[in-house]
Amino acid sequence: MKKIPALLLALCMIFALAACGRQAAPATPAPAAEQPAEQTAAGEPAPAEEPAPAPEEVELVVFAAASMTETMTEIKAMYEAANPGVTITYNFDSSGTLKTQIQEGAECDLFISAAPKQMNALDASCDAEKNPDGLDFVLQGSRVNLLENKVALVVPEGNPKGIESFDQLIEALKAGDILFAMGNSDVPVGQYTQKILAFYGLNEEELASAGKITYGSNVKEVTTQVKEAAVDCGIIYGTDAFSAGLEVVDTATKDMCGQVIYPAAVLKAAKHPAEAKAFLDYRTGPEADAVFESVGFSPMA
């Protein structure tokens, strides 16, 4: 009988040692992959965050006067860098040619003319004198006067004929000993030149018949003729003279040819009118103004 208490005592000691061993063993953390997923308040796994959608790809088609080629190319790079997904496609030419292309159905979101005349002819808000065909291509409320330019008399390097003013140009034309370049009659710079000749009382047709005038289909062609010294002088915009490195010997006054205003407008048939308006707004901001002013434009909007 004395063996039973001893046996019970031994069993108690064994159970006590086993319990101590269980308490001393450190807990093993579950592998990271087995950790419970984050849950919502309802106890369900939280949905994974979806990546932000890529910006919609937009191609803006902009028709702009040839005299804006350098500045608008620089602004394109600035705008596209700040607006991923937007691509600007330009069509540079004379404002008269661009107007005709718009009339014939060419795709265009935004039109910038080198003179009000071409824009007026597309704007239904203009009277019959300015818009004789009653065309309606301009989105109402979008039109702004964007820039002002100057009409300049320029000469080739070295100024071989010594022309230093419009007054001297007129005297040389009357004497018939000069070859002079100007834009065609459907080109704004040509129309401004016609006003200057009329201001001085000269007959353009007689001068052309006498072989004293050569023509360019846009301001860039006139600029090239002077740059290459194919003529003795020419009339272009001050901004084109700056970009081409030509010497300006005189600048026309408002009395001579009027104010040189560049209007801009979104077109009614624009595929992306909101984006076109945003681009137009950008071009009236400080970054674009700095580019325009660097070549001689005067921002108006």
What are these regions (language model features)?
Residues 1-11:
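Positively charged n-region of N-terminal signal peptides that target proteins for export
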Residues 14, 104-105, 228, 273:
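Alpha-helix termination/capping residues and helix-transition junctions
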Residues 15-19:
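C-terminal motif of bacterial Sec signal peptides marking the signal peptidase cleavage site
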Residues 21-41, 47-81, 96, 115-116, ...:
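Exported/periplasmic ABC-transporter solute-binding proteins
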Residues 88:
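Hydrophobic anchor at the start of a short beta-strand
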Residues 99, 105-134, 140-145:
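Short beta-strand-centered segments that line the small-molecule binding cleft or hinge
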